[in-house]
Amino acid sequence: MPKEFIVAIELGSSKMTGIAGQKNLDGSITVLATVEEDSSSCIRKGVIYNIDKTCQCLTNIIKKLKNILKQDITQVYVGVGGRSIRSIKNVIVKDLPGNTIISQEMINELMDINRNMTYPDQEILDAATQEYKIDNQYQIDPVGIQCNHLEGIFLNILWRKNFYNNINTCFENANIPIAEMYLAPLAMADSVLTDSEKRAGCMLVDLGADTTTVSVYYKGILRHLSVIPLGGGNVTKDLTCLQIEEPDAEKMKLKYAKAYTDINNIDPTLNYPIDKDRVVESKKFIEIVEARVEEIVENAWFQIPVEFSDKLLGGIILTGGGSNMPEIDKVFKTHTHIDKVRIAKFVSQTVNSRDPKITNHDGTMNTVLGLLAKGDMNCAGDEIGTDLFSNSAEKPVAAEQHKAPRNPNETAGKGVVLTAAEKAAADEAARKQKELEEAEARLLAEKEAEEEEKRRKENSLIHKMMRGFKKFVKDTISEEE
């Protein structure tokens, strides 16, 4: 087995996926191993709710990968997503002295102020710069421009603090170091969207089991991100009204369900078998499926900010397991009135693999492959020997790689989520900077107070009388001389 590889883990609502692979010089990816664990008992709507069971799933994922790779794993890349992730705009204003030339330090200051914003029970995972307002004009890169008034417009991506803390706790308890955390929707977007689609304006919809994630890009920049707590699993749950268990409902959905069926093509005599003794009319089955699909599509379209609804020249891109439902693209065309709809069955990178989960090209592996593509540090550890009598001291050891400490501004808008350690370091740096600024402000205030006291004394009545008396004495002496 290779001595170097990258490992990524996706925390999905229906399954947890682990993948190991190598990035080749030609830009392609070679997948070395893929494993899965059922996560339905510990992750709901993409959010961890049972820490112990999640730790066990993570441990099993790593154990399976190590057995295949015959090597230890020192760290992993992790995708962050799920319910309650949302984006919110924030504007930071700075008035400048007349005709000030904007420097990179000024831009960094705006970014720092924005990053240190606080939201009740929310954590800022990332902040994507939208644009800058220079006096009355908008610019993407304002450095070097003269102005009196500077505004930074940012898109802050928020998540519940306890959800963020739970992820860090699970990996700590499972003793699995995190190489880097990424916003899963952004990692996937970079792998399935073209640069042209991002520039022209597009809507990316990831149709998952428990959630549907909507991302909007325009002029190459992320403009909106939201997660809807609805997915393909809701269709399955609706079908249980036929008095069948969820596993059987899922099988029926995969075999018979279509997102849209022309009413003229519905055969009133056609029945679908539920079990060996029961059937359901195809018309009733179709109504159940279509009602939920329409709700998901309408909710996804409702997420699009009004100012971008007419700027989606790149169209709508569908991905995820739910995009495999026949006629799903037609439903999106009908409800959004956008004819340009593409189904992204696979990532844009060339991927070498014989694993059916990869070669099926069904959209279910796009996120974890996107995470793998983001990796740039070796995750391989010691080789695991199979010879019980070999000298363990002679085993080759792979060098561990760790990223140097970074300022959050370096990765802003790229989907990189600070780990708990990085966040603690950033918070400490922000605290020290705030203390320094407060100390400077106090010194300035004290100096101004001293000058004011001096002016006050100079303008006091006694001081004026003393100055007048001194002047009188001086003038008198001059006359006598």
For each of these PLM feature ranges, what is it?
Residues 88, 213-215, 225:
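Short helix/loop capping segments that flank catalytic or ligand/cofactor-binding pockets
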Residues 8-9, 18, 78, 171, ...:
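Residue-level signature of catalytic and energy-coupling elements of molecular machines
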Residues 1-15, 19-202, 259, 307, ...:
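Nucleotide/phosphate-binding catalytic cleft detector across ATP-hydrolyzing
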Residues 20-21, 90-91, 216-218, 329-331:
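Short amphipathic alpha-helical segments
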Residues 134-144, 203-209, 294-302:
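Short, composition-biased local secondary-structure segments
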Residues 9-15, 80-81, 196, 204-211, ...:
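A short acidic Gly-Thr/Ser loop motif
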Residues 157-160, 322, 361:
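Conserved phosphate/pyrophosphate-binding and hydrolysis machinery centered on Walker-type P-loop NTPases
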Residues 1-6, 23, 31-36, 72-75, ...:
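C-terminal region/appendage detector
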